[in-house]
Amino acid sequence: WYINQYDGKVPYEDMFFEELIPYMEKTYRIRSDKESRAIAGLSMGGYGSFLYSLHHPDMFCACAPLSAAVFDDTVMEARKARSHKDLFNRLFGPGDEHWKQNNVLKILSDWDQNNLPKIRYYIDCGDDDGLLDGNMQVHQIMRQKGIRHEFRVRDGGHSWTYWRTALPEVLKFVSQTFCRS
């Protein structure tokens, strides 16, 4: 899920920022400034891209989550008690603290109006995708907060057939964001 596991056993987010990005910058001829870096992902990776952009707003100029796995507290509680119980308890722990620190909706809702992230967002989710409600909640919070974003709901579900049609638009959006910087 691209987060640091609550018990510290799997520090995925730390690894991404402390090891992977420095390795990429050292190994390849890439620019290391925020204006030249975007993040995108689909499903669980969409959640990760949202989260990384919110935890590290100084690192990215654009974020493009597709069909992001964003859940509110009620969905999360239901999932902890059902089929995904082992997974979610392993990631977020038995309490709510780690969940709150990694809840995209809560982070956005709590964001200081005077210190909004200077990141352009492109959010895309299919109308038949079970994750649409969470993505719509993100859109509503962003509108209320005045966070710049594009929000697309198109015909389709949670599948590569859907995402393949979104990727050209995502690349265009990221390219335009780089050009503006």
Predicted regions and their residues:
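Non-catalytic cap/lid and distal C-terminal segments of serine-dependent acyl enzymes
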Residues: 1-181
